[in-house]
Design a protein with these regions (language model features):
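Conserved P-loop
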Residues: 1-76, 80-82, 88
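Short, well-ordered coil/turn elements that cap or connect secondary structure elements
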Residues: 24, 40, 125, 160-161
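Conserved GTP-binding G-domain of TRAFAC-class P-loop NTPases and closely related GTPase folds
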Residues: 138-223
Length: 223
């Protein structure tokens, strides 16, 4: 099975910047909203495909959008993939379906997002890691949690519970455990409590911990 990893943090905290130490052949980036990286790089960024159509309902458009993402993840040749920023999948669907009445749409939104995570978990590729870069917000206890679109969705889905590895990014650092400040969590002994916001280091450490194939270029392997 592939491994989904969640990275949460406020805008500008260093989530996307953490990709800087990857080489272009090592990482694929699916951009939901932005089209460029915050540093100079030859890493390929794929903008999410537009499915706007007068003949399709907003619900159908969003199903097509998620299906396209799943297809890209499955076909991508890199061992590591990033979805940046994944919370816009929820936010954009909310705006797309703003004219729909009733609560069923919130259940649909939660199901679409959950199914994407489950797709990664069930993908028959033991060496693939998919990173969900996601904005955070404060919960009722004052901790940073996954930003969703309100209590209606939170009641349907605990996003953090779908991941074994959740990192909290703040001030260009990753925090790996819930210390009262966030909902971060990682397996015992995988990381120190505080590490640099270097997703390449995270990727290498996770692969070593779980015995996954290394994600290195041919030049690196020959050294």
């Amino acid at each position: 099975m592939a491994l989904p990893v969640l990275v949460i943090g406020r805008s500008g905290s260093g989530k996307t910047y953490s990709l800087k130490n990857f080489k272009p052949e090592e990482i694929g980036v699916i951009s939901v909203e932005k089209g460029r990286l915050p540093f100079k790089s030859e890493i390929k960024v794929i903008r999410i495909k537009s499915f706007d159509s007068a003949e399709a309902s907003p619900a159908q458009i969003n199903v097509a959008r998620y299906s396209w993402i799943k297809s890209v993840i499955k076909q991508c040749k890199t061992k590591s993939i990033v979805i940046d920023d994944s919370q816009y999948l929820l936010a954009n669907e909310l705006f797309d379906r703003a004219n729909e009445k009733g609560y069923d749409k919130f259940t649909n939104m939660a199901a679409n997002f959950r199914d994407l995570i489950h797709f990664v978990n069930e993908l028959e590729d033991d060496d693939k890691i998919v990173y969900f870069l996601h904005h955070s917000e404060l919960d009722g206890d004052g901790r940073e949690k996954v930003k969703t679109i309100g209590k209606m969705l939170d009641e349907k889905l605990c996003v953090e519970g779908c991941f074994d590895v959740v990192l909290y990014c703040q001030d260009n650092k990753f925090f790996t455990q819930a210390n009262g400040q966030s909902v971060a969590k990682t397996p015992e002994g995988m990381f120190e409590l505080e590490i640099p916001n270097d997703l390449k280091f995270v990727d290498t450490t996770i692969r070593d911990y779980y015995g996954m194939e290394e994600n290195n270029t041919k030049e690196d392997k020959q050294k």
